[in-house]
Amino acid sequence: MGTGLFGTGQTAIRATQDLQIISGLPPLVREDDNYRAQLTLRNTTAKPMKVEVAARATLLELQPQTVDIPAGEAREVAWNVTAPAQLGQIRSEAILWEIEARDTLGGARDALKARQRIVPAVPLTVQQATLVQLEGPLTLEVVPPADALPGRGGLKLALQPKLAEGLPGVRDWFARYPFTCLEQKTSRSIGLRDAKLWQTVVAQLPTYLDKDGLASYFPPRDGEAERGSDVLTAYLLAATHEAAGIEPGFAVPDEVRAPMERGLIAFVEGRIQREFWSPRKDLDVRKLAALEALSRYGKAQGRMLGSITIAPNQWPTHAVIDWLNILRRVADVPQREQRIAEATQVLKSRLSYQGTKLVFSTERDDYWWWLMTNGDVNTARLILAVLDDPAWKDDMGRLANGFIGRQQRGAWHTTTANLWGGLALEKFSAKFEAQPVAGATRASVGAGAPAAVDWARVERVKSTDPAGAPHQTTWFGAPASPGSLRNNTMFLPWAQEPGRQPLNVAHTGTGRPWLTLQSVAAIALKAPFAAGYQVKKTVTPVEQAVAGRYSRGDVLRVTLEVNAAADMTWVVVSDPIPGGATLLGTGLGRDSQIATQGEKRSGGAWPAFEERSFEAFRSYYEYVPKGTFKLDYTMRLNNVGEFALPPTRVEALYAPEMFGESPNPRVKVEAGR
């Protein structure tokens, strides 16, 4: 149409203020990091300034400073501080800053509020845990782990009137879980009953679907072949359907679910194919999982079984459970009643108990980690499958107790097991537990001061409560969420006396509360540890101001060499970075394409997704073959100080007993020349 009708023109808008504060605080630090908290003050006027700067920060003592700033120039001010250790050990995990600057000559002012995240260098972890029902006084001998850091940790006791109130050990496990694929974000949001996180997952979910409607663990890259996973899609639809039976808000919206259903139907009918590495043939088993998910929404039909060889005796247990659920929901399957009886008999014949712990006779062959399933998942899903079946009524109490017996350190092994497990025990409790709890539960260690839970004060967190208020000073565990209980926990520090001390717990009143007892300690890794993976780290300067030492502004190349003992799917490599450092290669501002040009990859593993944060570099692999692979990443050191680093870690996400760790020394960064 040309410019005749519209005309042309331009203008420039410049907004500024006479005095500006620009933060140079590292976005993340770790407890006891010694660092230079730096700010830049800018004088945008044509006159010199004499600026007084006053700063306040959580648990830090900061002296006011005065600085002369010539016209049109900037000056840096800084305080040498140590990150308060106690802030890294509570849920708020923040140093809150308030900075005010005033020109004493002209009166110009500026103010800034900033928030630094602070995390533990050696985090508290659960060393041992148990879940028991208090049917009488409980006495156990307890002792802190030999290598535990002094003054940290103790015994956490959480009480629930019934299992339907949730499992504190599982919630704590989810709260600490660091990884972020679609399955993990979904499982965490439901496991924590975090409605806000779930809404974020729902909003992002369409970006994870390929053109066929199948979900990917990470958002597909442009131009990639259709690589959405039928296994992940079936899990998402099945798990959210089960969760929605407890809280309807965790259902997948119809408009998001519809393409996923179409993708699974096309997969089952053979109109699309998905081929992934696996140690054995699994197509029939994957189709059963897809049909089980579809059957929950009335989208499965008997004719869809045509390509599947029906052989429940030869299937892994998770496939038999899928088969039983399909038979119950799909009315037009031939010989339906006979096959339900057959599947029930197969499942009952595989059950056995080691003491109170439930195991399957086929446990070794049931570990299909590449399909995100294992004996824990199978037990939870079996409870859900037979909860309302009269033929299983007499088995339910033993099944639930046997499933609790499979826990290690207060939770199960994987995200999928903890999600299914939490749902299973909540639904079991809602059906079979009715007696209320009243009175008081008291606990003490040795001659130490006792603690108590008064059941008259135990109440639910409300959505109207101030955001974060119930848990900002919590020293360990999951945050409170609406609907969960509060005033139901006790903390007992480790006894001052050496050696074993008796823990005594007793309930007076009505009911039989459930006790989750966790032994919590901070233990630093002192030497490399390999359980399926070995990891070696090499740091090489790319740009270095002073040879042989690290200075602010230096650019470093980090090489991680990983040796894998076996083929494995979905492996993550996680390497921490010093406080204030920047990972290059993001393509964002202040990035350097030149500095990252020398990065190399070697070996048979190629990343499906890379995550760059202020805390760590993480690389996720869909498949890692046996043998050695290497990866590089590049970072810039931005802050002066001495910084602690947690261990470098490699972990198989769905076989977490396969992992490797290597400790990292503190990193000292000096001022540049």
Model-predicted segments: where are they?
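Proline-enriched interdomain boundary motifs that mark the N-terminal boundary
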Residues: L19-G24, V535
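Extracellular acidic loop/turn motifs
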Residues: T45-M49, D567
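Short beta-strand and strand-turn-strand segments in soluble, beta-rich domains
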Residues: L5-F6, Q17-I21, R56-P64, A71-E73, ...
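Extended, solvent-exposed functional surface patches
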Residues: Q38, A78, Q86-K281, K287-E292, ...
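Long, domain-scale non-catalytic interaction/scaffolding regions in large secretory-pathway
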Residues: M1, A57-L59, R75-V77, V81, ...
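Short beta-strand segments of immunoglobulin-like
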Residues: L25-R30, T66-V67, G410, A545-R549
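Short beta-strand edge segments in extracellular beta-sheet folds
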Residues: A12-D18, L28-R30, R56, D68-P70, ...
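Short edge beta-strand/loop segments characteristic of extracellular beta-sandwich folds
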Residues: R36-T44, T559-N563
